[in-house]
Amino acid sequence: VTARVPGPTDWEPIVSGNAELELSPVSTGGAAALRMDFDFKGAGGFVVARRALRRAMPEEFALTFRLRGRGPVNNLELKLVDVTGQNVWRHVQKDLRLPPRWKRMRVESRDIDFAWGPSSGGRIKTLGGMEFAIVAGEGGKGTVWIADVQIEDCTPTQAPRADASSAIPGFDAAGALLGSGWKPRPEDAKPWIVIDTVEPRVIGGLIVEWLHEAPPSGFRVRASNDGSR
């Protein structure tokens, strides 16, 4: 399920120090976009485009948008503010070289860290606002266009399943997922096990817990999007 964030209107500028930011909705390349014209006036600081947006957030999600621009190398920050306005989550892309042509950007929820607020952590449950911030690196002045902002629900809906080349009674492939363990038959010269997530998922890592009584052995870990390779 994908929810499209409303178009390039209703964004408000926030700046620090003497920095300047002008926001305007434009049509470019057949797309409605938010245009950010910024000028750090030879100093540091930040400029922010902020929009109020109330929405229940899925447990796992991805934020996608298209980006292009021109200007010096600076940091781009994406911030999510909860409905209280006090808790903030942030993704920082440091030293961003603005692409002259439209580039699709994708930020997974696991890469959006809790930044500050009284909740002291956890995930965002109800969105209250969204911010795109340009934080001075080289500073200078330039223009950024942002379009097609979407929130994609990536919460798994199906349980993973497992299959194996063989198994002894009581230690079938499913045991690898349930914690009881998987054991191939002694005569299985080339044992293998496949764990299928059924639907696309972001995999942060894999922990292999070797059963205490199992003899030491080498193994390979392979990954595939469709199981064909």
Regions found by a protein language model. Give the residues of each.
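Short, surface-exposed loop and linker segments with low hydrophobicity and enrichment for Pro/Ser/Thr
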Residues: 22-31, 67, 117-129, 199
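N-terminal, post-signal-peptide region of Sec/Tat-exported proteins
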Residues: 34-36
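Short loop/turn motifs at secondary-structure junctions
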Residues: 101, 123-126, 145, 202
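Hydrophobic/aromatic beta-strand segments within beta-rich folds
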Residues: 63-65, 107, 127-135, 191-209, ...
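Solvent-exposed, conformationally flexible loop/turn segments
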Residues: 1-6, 58, 98-102, 179-180
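Extracellular ligand-binding interfaces
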Residues: 38-118, 139-145, 150, 207-229
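Disordered, acidic Ser/Thr/Pro-rich linker "stalks" and the adjacent N-terminal cap
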Residues: 3-4, 11-13, 17, 24-32, ...
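Extracellular glycan-associated modules
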Residues: 7-13, 119-129, 140-143, 193
